[in-house]
C-alpha cells in the first residue's frame, strides 16, 4: 500500500502532507505530559519488523501485516498514529519504501485512517467480544486505508487511470488481504489480553518476550524475501502498476534501498537492514516517549 513517487499529482501529494502534519501535530499536543510507557517504541518496532515479512500470494503479488488497527488498540489513536508515522517515515527515508513525495498520503492512509478507524471500531464493539472486535477493526481499518489510496491515485492525472480502475484494484485486493490483517490483529490482542492484561490497559510494557519476537521476525525476514523472490512477488499496488504498464519514478533512492546493502549478499543485507531499521524505530519511539513525559 506504500504509494511510490510518480503516482500522485503534486497538488494531491501536498494536500495530504498538510493534512497528515496537522493530525500528527494535534496528536503530539494531546500526548504532552502523558506518561507513555516503553510500549510505544516496542509496538512501533514490532510493526516495522512485521512489515518486513512479505508472504507471496498466487498471482504474482504479496502481502504483509500493516498493523495500524493494532497500534491504535494497544496505544490509543494519537500515540498509535505517531508510532505508525515513525515506521512509515523510516521506511521512506532509509529504505525508499514508499515515495518521498507520497509520504504524506501514505501517513494519512496507514497512520491516520487505519489507526483511528481501527481504534474506534474496536472500542465500539469491544464489549461484545474482544477478539471479534479486533478482527473487524483490523479488516475495516486496512480496507478503508486502501480505498483512500485508490482515491488519491485515481484523481491524480499522473497515474493515467481513473477511479474506475484504482478503486476496484485497491479496495478489492485489500478487502481480501484484510481478512489476514484482522486475523493477526485479533490473535495478538487476544494473546496479550490473556497473558498481560495490564498491557492492553496501557499500564505496563511487554518485557523480554516482545523483544524476542521482534528479533525473531527480523531474523527470518531474509527467508521471506527469498521465498517471495522465487515466485516473482510484488506488492498489490506494484503488481497492478506492472499489469497496466506503469513504472515508478523514484525521486529519492534511500540510504539502504529495498532493504539491502550495496555489495553485500541480498539476504545478509536484508537482515542487517532489518536490524538497522528496528534500532532506529526503537530509538525514535523511546525519544518520543521521553518527550511526551517531559513536555
Swiss-Prot record:
Give the residue range of the signal peptide.
Answer: none
Task: Give the keywords, sorted.
Answer: Cell membrane, Ion transport, Membrane, Nickel, Nickel transport, Transmembrane, Transmembrane helix, Transport
Q: What is the recorded membrane topology of this protein?
A: Multi-pass membrane protein
Subcellular localization(s) per the UniProt record: Cell membrane
- Main location class: membrane
Q: Name one GO cellular component term.
A: plasma membrane
| One GO BP annotation of this record | nickel cation transport
**Transmembrane segments in this chain: where?**
8-28, 39-59, 70-90, 98-118, 135-155, 175-195, 211-231, 268-288
One Pfam family of this protein, by short name?
A: PDGLE
Chain's role: May be involved in nickel transport.
Entry similarity comment: Belongs to the CbiM family. NikM subfamily.
Name of this chain's protein: Putative fused nickel transport protein NikMN
What is the organism of origin for this protein? Archaeoglobus fulgidus (strain ATCC 49558 / DSM 4304 / JCM 9628 / NBRC 100126 / VC-16)
Amino acid at each position: 500500500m506504500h504509494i511510490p513517487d510518480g503516482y500522485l499529482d503534486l497538488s494531491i501529494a501536498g494536500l495530504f502532507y498538510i493534512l497528515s502534519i496537522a493530525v500528527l501535530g494535534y496528536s503530539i499536543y494531546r500526548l504532552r505530559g502523558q506518561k507513555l510507557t516503553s510500549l510505544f517504541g516496542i509496538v512501533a518496532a514490532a510493526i516495522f519488523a512485521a512489515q518486513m515479512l512479505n508472504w507471496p500470494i498466487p498471482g504474482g503479488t504479496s502481502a504483509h501485516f500493516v498493523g495500524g488497527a493494532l497500534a491504535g488498540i494497544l496505544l490509543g489513536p494519537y500515540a498509535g498514529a505517531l508510532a505508525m508515522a515513525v515506521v512509515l517515515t523510516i521506511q521512506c527515508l532509509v529504505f525508499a519504501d514508499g515515495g518521498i513525495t507520497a509520504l504524506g498520503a501514505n501517513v494519512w492512509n496507514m497512520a491516520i485512517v487505519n489507526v483511528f478507524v481501527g481504534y474506534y471500531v474496536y472500542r465500539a464493539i469491544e464489549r461484545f467480544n474482544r477478539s471479534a472486535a479486533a478482527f473487524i477493526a483490523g479488516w475495516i481499518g486496512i480496507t478503508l486505508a486502501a480505498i483512500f489510496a485508490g482515491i488519491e491515485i485515481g484523481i491524480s492525472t499522473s497515474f493515467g487511470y481513473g477511479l474506475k480502475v484504482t478503486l476496484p484494484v485497491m479496495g478489492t485486493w485489500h478487502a481480501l488481504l484484510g481478512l489476514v490483517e484482522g486475523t493477526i490483529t485479533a490473535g495478538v490482542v487476544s494473546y496479550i489480553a490473556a497473558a498481560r492484561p495490564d498491557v492492553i490497559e496501557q499500564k505496563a510494557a511487554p518485557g523480554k518476550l516482545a523483544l524476542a519476537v521482534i528479533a525473531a521476525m527480523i531474523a527470518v525476514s531474509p527467508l521471506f524475501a527469498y521465498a517471495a523472490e522465487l515466485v516473482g512477488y510484488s506488492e498489490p499496488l506494484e503488481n497492478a502498476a506492472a499489469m497496466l504498464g506503469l513504472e515508478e519514478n523514484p525521486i529519492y533512492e534511500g540510504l539502504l534501498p529495498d532493504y539491502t546493502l550495496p555489495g553485500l549478499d541480498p539476504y545478509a543485507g536484508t537482515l542487517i537492514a532489518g536490524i538497522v531499521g528496528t534500532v532506529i524505530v526503537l530509538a525514535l519511539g523511546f525519544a518520543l516517549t521521553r518527550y511526551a513525559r517531559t513536555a
